Amino acid sequence: MKFVAFERAKQGTGASRRLRITGRTPGIVYGGGAEPQQIEIDHNALWHALKKEAFHAAVLDMELDGKDNKVLLRDVQMHPFKQLILHVDFQRVDASTRLHMKVPLHYSGDENSPAVKTEGCIANHVITEIEVLCLPTDLPEFIAVDLSGLKKGASLHLADVALPKGVTAVTRGNKNPVLVSVVVIGAAEAPVAEAGAAPVAAAAPAAAGKAAPAAKAPAAKKK
């Protein structure tokens, strides 16, 4: 993806506030063996770009002062309750240095799998992104995962996924985590049904234990 940024001359809280009033967002670009540079970006263009998955996970082309820079989005500061981007950080990319990034997983085909189609199960997406290590030219926007082979009682692990060339998964603790689990629909709904039946069952002892109204004393006989 490509976007345009401009060099920002004035710095400081007051200058940034005035910049936002004019519809621009302050930011910074750093790394890559060069000095950090203050920048500004059109707020509306940045707002729409942030809605795209690739803007968060891919190497971006930033045009700054007529020159193209390869950068990564590193941080976005949002206003606590307004639809306003307060500040944005980018990191320059060195073509010879490997990147440590999070890449989204795009699942597909589960509706055609035996587990979902004929065995009464659903596919539970346990993990939706993984951390990877790769060169900038090898960084994928996403990793496609085919679930059409899922069967009842099975799970899909990280080791079952073919990663793109030059991409290595980074894991912590569990070296082969579960990405997708297969859940039987009836088993998933059973606890809900039992929980709903509990108040009815509890009502029975209460009704049984309710005291009968006291009988009236017989009227005294006239002498």
UniProtKB/Swiss-Prot annotation:
Belongs to the bacterial ribosomal protein bL25 family. CTC subfamily. This is one of the proteins that binds to the 5S RNA in the ribosome where it forms part of the central protuberance. Keywords: Ribonucleoprotein, Ribosomal protein, RNA-binding, rRNA-binding. GO terms for cellular component: cytosolic large ribosomal subunit. GO terms for molecular function: 5S rRNA binding; structural constituent of ribosome. The keyword Iron-sulfur does not apply. Coiled coil: none annotated. This is Large ribosomal subunit protein bL25. It comes from Albidiferax ferrireducens (strain ATCC BAA-621 / DSM 15236 / T118) (Rhodoferax ferrireducens). Part of the 50S ribosomal subunit; part of the 5S rRNA/L5/L18/L25 subcomplex. Contacts the 5S rRNA. Binds to the 5S rRNA independently of L5 and L18. GO terms for biological process: translation. Gene3D superfamilies: Ribosomal protein L25, beta domain (2.170.120.20), Ribosomal Protein L25, Chain P (2.40.240.10). The gene is rplY. CDD domains: Ribosomal_L25_TL5_CTC. InterPro entries: Rbsml_bL25/Gln-tRNA_synth_N, Ribosomal_bL25/Gln-tRNA_synth, Ribosomal_bL25_b-dom, Ribosomal_bL25_C, Ribosomal_bL25_long, Ribosomal_bL25_short, Ribosomal_L25_dom, Ribosomal_uL5_bac-type.
